[in-house]
Curated annotation (Swiss-Prot):
This is Flagellin A. Belongs to the bacterial flagellin family. Keywords: Bacterial flagellum, Secreted. The lineage of its organism: Bacteria, Pseudomonadati, Campylobacterota, Epsilonproteobacteria, Campylobacterales. InterPro entries: Flagellin, Flagellin_C, Flagellin_C_sub2, Flagellin_hook_IN_motif, Flagellin_N. It is found in: Secreted; Bacterial flagellum. It comes from the Bacteria.
């Protein structure tokens, strides 16, 4: 090789290598000091793009986890509030159960109702004040609320919390048929009991025999209540139209085929002769006699079989119908209509021409006065449904005139046939009580008025035409049947809250599972980003040592390259 002075190639090569080593050393020091393999786009352009995408995904997943935890906090707040509401409903049902026995007086029942009213107020207070970050949770407005729980848009979970005010829960369906006066065989079917299928009950005979009647039908319905969601009660009761008046039964007087015979009884049955005679055979007839607070005779079927009177119980007893199979009441806890079909439905007062009282009652509605329509649907009344009116002295005026002791005597100017003109009652609803022609204008007869002296028939002023119809009932548990109804309504309310809580619980579990999943995903994404972005200290330390040594050796090489030019001077000596 020749000796040159102008261009020191060896020195230039040494410098170039030193520059490379210097950059490698700077990069290595930058990585070791930052802990990152990629400190700028120049370090790894494609790797940086992937790492940035992974970092964005990991950060978004972190916020999604926070969103999920916020959602859990909201749902847990609502859940705990409803847990307290359930305790209140349990107390309401307990107090209603306490009121549902005739050992309670009106005074004590009123006190229990006052307690229930306060409990309902607190239940509504919880519903109206439970909130999270200013959002009401239990008032019905928290519907289809979305929570972003993914790294991409529209990866959401929806949550809804139903309203829990007393006006929104406990809605219970009550349906009560008309009073039945005919026997038969009933084949009852519940239509679409589960939204799809029909449910057919076993046929039940409606008669006066043991093991038949509305009691047997109610037992069959209640036996399947867990499947259909429908429960039944019955009220087979014949109540006198007025306080017992002196009279007597016929020699062949019988109830449900059991002959009782002739019984003389006084006003109000003061000596108890009529009631005692009927109760003497109650184990055989299934019918028990008593007097109500107004002194009226009450015949009650204990097991739900019909009540059939043959012979004559006498006008003084005030019993309108010699054959009575009672009223059937149905209760459904979800507030929807009870759709029925079948055969022989007129025997249970639910035929095509029968007036069926229907109502859906919420928890709050049970707090105040129960309307006549609601009371009748709940089965408060033993009479015909729909509030129809009827003549109370007999099934018709003609029938009344035909009975002994009616006050109509020969020569009075009233014949049995003339009574047909009064055998229809005109009101908001019309009920025919016997075959009728028209209302005669000859005799002025009005509800509760009797005949006036001016009519020329003052000797018959004892005749009355009255009404028997549904009427308003006092609030809640202040009556026995009201207490029973509040028990049903409270049970429905408990079921409603349990359904809402169950839905909340399902969403909580869904969110928890999602949080667990995206937490694992976030860890894996961060791990993948770390593999790309973070420095491997072991490897980079080796690179640093290499670059450091090369930098030192490069400096030495440059020094040697520069000193090698001195050899040219020796040639010139």
């Amino acid at each position: 090789m020749g000796f040159r002075i102008n261009t020191n190639v060896a020195a230039l090569n040494a410098k170039a290598n030193s520059d490379l080593n210097s950059r490698a050393l700077d990069q290595s020091l930058s990585r070791l000091s930052s802990g990152l393999r990629i400190n700028s786009a120049a370090d790894d352009a494609s790797g940086m793009a992937i790492a940035d995408s992974l970092r964005s995904q990991a950060n978004t997943l972190g916020q999604a986890i926070s969103n999920g935890n916020d959602a859990l906090g909201i749902l847990q707040t609502a859940d705990k509030a409803m847990d307290e509401q359930l305790k209140i409903l349990d107390t309401i049902k307990t107090k209603a159960t306490q009121a549902a026995q005739d050992g309670q007086s009106l005074k004590t029942r009123t006190m229990l109702q006052a307690d229930i009213n306060r409990l309902m107020e607190e239940l509504d207070n919880i519903a109206n004040t439970t909130s999270f970050n200013g959002k009401q949770l239990l008032s019905g407005g928290f519907t289809n609320q979305e929570f972003q729980i993914g790294s991409s848009s529209n990866q959401t979970i929806k949550a809804s919390i139903g309203a829990t005010q007393s006006s929104k829960i406990g809605v219970t369906r009550f349906e009560t048929g008309s009073q039945s006066f005919s026997s038969g065989t009933v084949g009852l079917t519940i239509k679409n009991y589960n939204g799809i299928e029909d449910f057919k009950f076993d046929s039940v005979v409606i008669s006066t025999s043991v093991g038949t009647g509305l009691g047997a039908l109610a037992e069959e319905i209640n036996r399947n209540a867990d499947k259909t969601g429908i429960r039944a009660t019955f009220d087979v009761k014949s109540v006198g139209a007025y306080a017992i008046k002196a009279g007597n039964t016929s020699q062949d007087f019988a109830i449900n085929g059991v002959v009782i015979g002739k019984v003389d009884y006084s006003d109000g049955d003061e000596n108890g002769s009529l009631i005692s005679a009927i109760n003497a055979v109650k184990d055989t007839t299934g019918v028990q006699a008593s007097k109500d607070e107004n002194g009226k005779l009450v015949l009650t079927s204990a097991d739900g079989r019909g009540i059939k009177i043959t012979g004559s119980i006498g006008v003084g007893a005030g019993i309108l119908h010699t054959e009575n199979y009672g009223r059937l009441s149905l209760v459904k806890n979800d507030g929807r209509d009870i759709n029925i079909s079948g055969t022989g439905l007129s025997a249970i007062g639910m035929g095509a021409t029968d007036m069926i009282s229907q109502s859906s009652v919420s928890l709050r509605e049970s707090k105040g006065q129960i309307s006549a329509a609601n009371a009748d649907a709940m089965g408060f009344n033993a009479y015909n449904g729909g509030g129809a009116k009827q003549i109370i002295f007999a099934s018709s005026i003609a029938g009344f005139m035909s009975q002994a002791g009616s006050g109509f005597s020969a020569g009075s100017g009233f014949s049995v046939g003339s009574g047909k003109n009064y055998s229809a009652i005109l009101s908001a609803s019309i009920q025919i009580v016997s075959s009728a022609r028209s209302i005669s204008s000859t005799y002025v007869v009005s509800t509760g008025s009797g005949f006036s002296a001016g009519s020329g028939n003052s000797q018959f002023a004892a005749l009355r035409i009255s009404t028997v119809s549904a009427h308003d009932e006092t609030a809640g548990v202040t009556t026995l049947k009201g207490a029973m109804a509040v028990m049903d309504i409270a049970e429905t309310a408990i079921t409603n809250l349990d359904q809402i809580r169950a839905d909340i619980g399902s969403v909580q579990n869904q969110i928890t599972s999602t949080i667990n999943n995206i937490t694992v995903t976030q860890v894996n994404v961060k791990s993948a980003e770390s593999q790309i972005r973070d420095v491997d200290f072991a490897s980079e330390s080796a690179n640093y040592s290499k670059a450091n040594i090369l930098a030192q050796s490069g400096s030495y090489a440059m020094a040697q390259a520069n000193s090698s030019q001195q050899n040219v001077l020796r040639l010139l000596q």
